């Protein structure tokens, strides 16, 4: 055997040769650390977010074609890249050379905010264009299905990509065949004045053309290598692992005989996550990526044979081609497989994962195995002993020894038979999110009838997600043989299958009753599908489906999206070069798109740098009996392990009223609490050592996880907050009706794309320390680090260039991590880097507070609410953090848009044994307002009115007073409501929804509209201070720094717009480097929607100071340039630097009196959403959303609209699909994108229309603008209440007329189980207390 151990591949056109390759090295760290190509980002490490997307290209010497495909660099072992060409975002374009059209368009179409996900987005689209220069919208959405974005809401990204499509900008999906952009801007009414409608915020005609001839060519050397068919086996090894890549089938069998336990990997999408997340280790890996026999495609007389080495994407293309060429009766299996291949994972994973690997892995929630299991498929196996064929059946899927592969065998190919006439195959799945999400339950079903008699001859039904393996209901199917296909058979089948496919109440994954319901709901769908086909085949003998049932068979989800935007006109008196009010591109947009934007972990390694990782508690409430560090300390590369004992008297810091310990001392109070910190010379060694730290615990009582448990144990933080207005008790005596209710609202993970990251560098002189950190609050980082090191603050400088998303989650916990990291750096005199993995970040940092809201409302029969008594309980977690502030803001904002003449609201932050929850975009308002809106909805139901009528009758009117006695002018609130009513055609569509619901039993539509009043301010003048520093250099260029953090909201862009206006110079003349405590000290936190407000006023002040100094010089030489004026000023000894300062808004709140002026102004808005739900599965589709917002005078409509729609999508996720799951022991189950689902492109509204009200004056703010970062989150609940409306319609048709309270998030499980029917009544129910549930509702 001729062996080679040298690895050769190309990266961005440059040859890479590695002689000593570690098989455990993945491409992502290799690119970032070894090649310093940091454009490719770490987002999750498991192929679930797309941030690390690159293009892999290979030449096939047989077809003479080059195949380009997207791939997740975090899962690709570099050993698998021999002979491949890797292209990263740096390789397609750069600001130093030329940017690629993809990079240009995604930037100029405002498709970047924080920019962290952008390189992955760019590479997914770039790869698509390499294969399809003029893609369809279907191809476009498929290509982006594996990429997540937490900021933009996806609309601008889709708009950018549409410019490459065959019919650019067209929605391509309207029922009448007319694009939405050609329908008079979708028929949206124009406002009277001050605004204009545009489908885009960019000029398409200015874009660079896409020219395929200018792309990087595939390296000729690799083509020659491939043509030579080198017969050298590749062997790579390290101390821990060997990697074998055979070149022939015979050699593969020899390796498998020699190493029978070694996994055979193609794409590493199954083995890779097991190694990373489950700690599985394989000393030998076999990679047969060059063996032709594994990529066979054979069309035989009885079916199709597909090689086990084919990627799922290749299988999808092959099957799509087959179904085009063969009659439908032969391709039933292939249609079913295609249905699931379209939603299975993302494009990257589908291009990496192999068919054989997917089958052999036998994951219990596999989407393909249930279909293959019912289709009489067989597996062709091979070993040194010879060939063997086994059926792909339940015995194989459950790994029965006599039906499984032998250790020395490999899977060569799969036989998938053609279907026959009178044979029907279908596939079903339901997931938390429709694409790139593991199924909750999936199924494959096949039935074969006698010739035209409707009698079942064969029946096979398999399910995934309901057991440890794919389950086949063979006993039930056998009992149904010989029966007629009718409703009697269906009823018997449901009962048989529920009895056979049984689920324990404690089954992993939870959702047990939902899963039981899906089992028979899918069967009913199959029954309807087959019945419909039978009717078409033989109209005489088979009855038609009832018209009301036909919609049950229609697919909910559309891949086509259209949008219109309406933003403000620029006044005729404004100078043409004044950028204020123009849709200016995010000034880092191009750098985001080229990968040149530097984030914290992109900074180069410092000499002798160490890496720090944490060991966290595995118990929720326990005493630490002992910590054994000996084995971990003895490992190679480990420098130190620090515990609370090392930090001693600096192991805590008090920011609010309660100090929080950095590292646990004698007790732990939640799973995920920091216990000790491991310091090593590499990230790999630090993480390996952390796993060897042994901690012995002794559990303590009580274990408090839920709000109800905290109430029971009187466990809450002090003080209780209370807000009272009017006389509630007296008002209850005079109302017509009184109702009481409660609603639970789950928490939310920030899921910023860039995890917690920092690099602390000792300067080696005067004890100075530089802290580079991804944070919203540099001053706090400076203070906590200085306190920990017992240094004055002037020795510690904190630097933040940009943050890859934050949403409130990069403040207090970031400070604790930074303090420990700085302590380690100071102790050892070496730079220390700390970057949390996604799972660590989700476990440690907490998120949005879960809420329990209780309400008692007194109201008149016309819907007027005269008395409201509310109680808010938040699940604060184990420490105070910012929970009291969240409760306060929730109470102050709970009235939303409504005037309640008599109001009492109390709030408690509940202490529990969960990681501390913290600030999150909206800061208590999304929870508090949902409670209020739920009460409104229930009042409407009691009065027999629509919720919208009750909303408008209780809404603030013109000048009024809030419960805390602050004056409010609600004119723009009413205008937003009216404009949204008109823009959405609410009245007409409400009639259409009711008509649809009357005609359809299993699908229902809902329509809901909600108003928004969002107070903006931080509650005190001190919190609203801001400063800025502006320098003018002698060449006329300007450098501006300020205290705000750029975290995607475009604050730096707006600040440069301010400088441009105030100094009357082009924006290109102004530069902004980042934020540092060295240049702007004592800056407040960036949050609360006021970052641009406050810092903009400080920048404006600095500029006006400079302009006042320079006015005499400018007036003497009005035609001069800034270079002339700066030089003259210098010659005359005039200071060309100025500090700007803003004292903060006049704001205060007296909680003892329950009154004050805590806010500077109010943002108003309204949103209307229409949804369609599938009553059988709980699935939903957002058909259309219309949003109208009052933004004052927009500084930058592109950025402002981006904030509105990004917040809306994040809020939609909060209220619908984002679900945190904790075990009864307090362990977080949802620790990554595989388990926790944020909205993806498939969740976008099919139609999205956003309008800004005409300009309105607001004298105290920056150019009369308003901060919009947080307010739009709440508008996502328009989707929640539209679903509520649809569920109500379903329940009423089923005779369920009682009160309906739906908790948030309104997941598929809750939707389905609320749509009660004969199937939900049929399932068995477990008695509470008779089992230990998998998860506990928090």
From Swiss-Prot:
Outcome reported for the amino acid change (mutating residue 921 to H): Increases homodimerization; abolishes enzymatic activity on phenanthridine; decreases turnover number with benzaldehyde, phtalazine and chloroquinazolinone as substrate, while nearly no effect on the KM
Q: Which residues bind [2Fe-2S] cluster 1?
A: 44, 49, 52, 74
Q: Which PROSITE patterns match?
A: 2FE2S_FER_1 (PS00197), 2FE2S_FER_2 (PS51085), FAD_PCMH (PS51387), MOLYBDOPTERIN_EUK (PS00559)
Q: Does the keyword Lipoprotein apply?
A: no
Q: List the disulfide bonds.
A: none
Q: Where is the 2Fe-2S ferredoxin-type domain?
A: 5-92
Q: Does Zinc count among this protein's keywords?
A: no
Give UniProt keywords alphabetically: 2Fe-2S, Cytoplasm, FAD, Flavoprotein, Iron, Iron-sulfur, Lipid metabolism, Metal-binding, Molybdenum, Oxidoreductase, Phosphoprotein
**Residues in FAD-binding PCMH-type domain copies:** 236-421
- Cofactor annotation remark: Binds 2 [2Fe-2S] clusters per subunit. Binds 1 FAD per subunit.
Write out the catalysed reaction: an aldehyde + O2 + H2O = a carboxylate + H2O2 + H(+); retinal + O2 + H2O = retinoate + H2O2 + H(+)
| Phenotype for residue 1297 to R | Increases homodimerization and turnover number with phenanthridine as substrate; nearly no effect on kinetic parameters with benzaldehyde, phtalazine and chloroquinazolinone as substrate
**What does changing residue 1135 to S do?**
Increases homodimerization and turnover number with phenanthridine as substrate; nearly no effect on kinetic parameters with benzaldehyde, phtalazine and chloroquinazolinone as substrate
- Tell me one GO biological process term: lipid metabolic process
The subcellular localization recorded is: Cytoplasm
EC number(s) per UniProt?
1.2.3.1, 1.17.3.-
Tissues expressed in: Abundant in liver, expressed in adipose tissue and at lower levels in lung, skeletal muscle, pancreas. In contrast to mice, no significant gender difference in AOX1 expression level (at protein level).
Q: Provide the binding site for FAD.
A: 264-271, 345, 354, 358, 367, 411
Cofactors: [2Fe-2S] cluster; FAD; Mo-molybdopterin
Q: Name one GO molecular function term.
A: aldehyde oxidase activity
- Positions bound to [2Fe-2S] cluster 2: 114, 117, 149, 151
> What does the record's miscellaneous section state?
AOX genes evolved from a xanthine oxidoreductase ancestral precursor via a series of gene duplication and suppression/deletion events. Different animal species contain a different complement of AOX genes encoding an equivalent number of AOX isoenzymes. In mammals, the two extremes are represented by certain rodents such as mice and rats, which are endowed with 4 AOX genes, and by humans, whose genome is characterized by a single active gene.
Function text? Oxidase with broad substrate specificity, oxidizing aromatic azaheterocycles, such as N1-methylnicotinamide, N-methylphthalazinium and phthalazine, as well as aldehydes, such as benzaldehyde, retinal, pyridoxal, and vanillin. Plays a key role in the metabolism of xenobiotics and drugs containing aromatic azaheterocyclic substituents. Participates in the bioactivation of prodrugs such as famciclovir, catalyzing the oxidation step from 6-deoxypenciclovir to penciclovir, which is a potent antiviral agent. Is probably involved in the regulation of reactive oxygen species homeostasis.
Protein name per the record: Aldehyde oxidase
Originating species: Homo sapiens
Gene name, per UniProt, is: AOX1
